[in-house]
Amino acid sequence: MTIQHKQDLAQIRAMVPEMRRVKSIHFIGIGGAGMSGIAEVLLNEGYQITGSDIAENAVTERLAQKGAKVYIGHQATNVAEASVVVVSTAINEANPEVKAAREARIPVVRRAEMLAELMRFRHGIAVAGTHGKTTTTALVTQIYSEAGLDPTFVNGGLVKSAGTNARLGSSRILIAEADESDASFLHLQPMVCIVTNIEADHMDTYGGDFETLKQTFIDFLHNLPFYGQAIVCIDDPVIRELIPRISRQVITYGFSEDADVRIENYRQEGQQGKFTVVRKDCEALDITLNIPGRHNALNAAAAIAVATEDEIGDDAILAAMVGTQGTGRRFEHLGEFETGNGNVMLVDDYGHHPTEVDVTIQAARNGWQEKRLVMIFQPHRYSRTRDLYDDFANVLEQVDVLVMLDVYAAGEKAIAGADSRSLCRTIRSRGKIDPIFVADTQQLPEVLANILQEGDLLLAQGAGDIGKVARQLAALELNISNMKAK
């Protein structure tokens, strides 16, 4: 470590002076997107980082290469040297490392509490909402980076232009995705908040009461100082309803006529969206956004609203929009492959809520109108499938061919009537399409060999391990003849 690097670390750590007492930080579930980002930033700040997870992945390998000690499997001995233990939302009190930390009186904090410490003495920009958080966080980061402001960022997904989901910057700016799934975003004390939209999701956290969820978002916005800014999407009916209850400066964005930052003349040309952004007391911006879909135009407008309020130059905004490479697993183009049945385009997308799936379908339809849309869908969680069952059926019947995998349980027990077979039967009974249920992903090559045609757009959709499946298909280059042989 050079003298200059030591001085830089000292300056950064001086932002949180009381954290100097902390030497070693242990992350349970370190391989998750949200956890790994915080771990990487703290590692780069000079803290000793250890962590555990149930399996190796690319994230744990990268952290290990950077100097973290990563344990595969959870054991009480893993926390022996820890000053503090950070847990993800998926970790409960029965975890042996949590139990050992409690017994040793080692502080156990949630992910958002540690993120709040990173944000406490920085200029925090927090991005919340049911959908679009990861992409919006990446777009804000890209603009500030283009402007030479070198922000720290912690995102819930890969920022492709940076090659990572988190990075320690040299400025006081911290841009972070704020997670409402367990209400832990209430720990954050940002200077600027973005709320992209509010829908009924993660309702177990909120006792099944949508009013409680809405009030929690209001409470989140009221964590802003009195001089802070709430950047909200006025197109969302719930947000529009809540605006009179927000006692902070509100800046709106959207397609609506009364938006402070307004999108006009949107059109999609393949992978790119093109539109004009109209701002009060500023020149209009003609945007070329290098990711498709009206929903991404909204995400871009949120980022532009933040940057405009921070007086970032238009050149940086325009360069960030056209230069963005998007985020991992958000309409990610994995390639076009010449198969035994013809040329097929493969796209991978993380969307797992009906609204997210719907906007992905619309982006595919608008950008590639001549293509037949074949979707491999993996429902995520039985509880979400149960709660949004009819919405899923309504959205999924829009594709031309639907292949459905088993529900990715994410630790949940099966719920009768909320499984993939039931959902397939419901969609089939409506008469528009005939879904194909695939119980074992090993059967996918044979199924695809029988259904793919020249010019198809194959969309792998969901938040479980469907992303790995998509990459396996890409590695095979969708070679249907080889698939049939196997």
Curated annotation (Swiss-Prot):
Biological pathway: Cell wall biogenesis; peptidoglycan biosynthesis
Enzyme Commission number(s) from the entry: 6.3.2.8
Source taxonomy: Bacteria, Pseudomonadati, Pseudomonadota, Gammaproteobacteria, Vibrionales
Matching InterPro entries: Mur-like_cat_sf, Mur_ligase_C, Mur_ligase_C_dom_sf, Mur_ligase_cen, Mur_ligase_N, MurCDEF_pg_biosynth, UDP-N-AcMur_Ala_ligase_MurC
Name of this chain's protein: UDP-N-acetylmuramate--L-alanine ligase
Biological function: Cell wall formation.
Record has Cell wall biogenesis/degradation as a keyword: yes
Gene name as annotated: murC
A Gene Ontology BP annotation from the UniProt entry: regulation of cell shape
Gene Ontology MF term list: ATP binding; UDP-N-acetylmuramate-L-alanine ligase activity
Protein family: Belongs to the MurCDEF family.
Catalytic activity: UDP-N-acetyl-alpha-D-muramate + L-alanine + ATP = UDP-N-acetyl-alpha-D-muramoyl-L-alanine + ADP + phosphate + H(+)
Keyword entries, A-Z: ATP-binding, Cell cycle, Cell division, Cell shape, Cell wall biogenesis/degradation, Cytoplasm, Ligase, Nucleotide-binding, Peptidoglycan synthesis
Top EC group: ligase
Signal peptide bounds: none
Domain of life the protein comes from: Bacteria
Binding site for ATP: 129-135
UniProt xrefs under Pfam families: Mur_ligase, Mur_ligase_C, Mur_ligase_M
GO cellular component, one term: cytoplasm
Subcellular location(s) per record: Cytoplasm
PANTHER family per UniProt: UDP-N-ACETYLMURAMATE--L-ALANINE LIGASE (PTHR43445:SF3), UDP-N-ACETYLMURAMATE--L-ALANINE LIGASE-RELATED (PTHR43445)
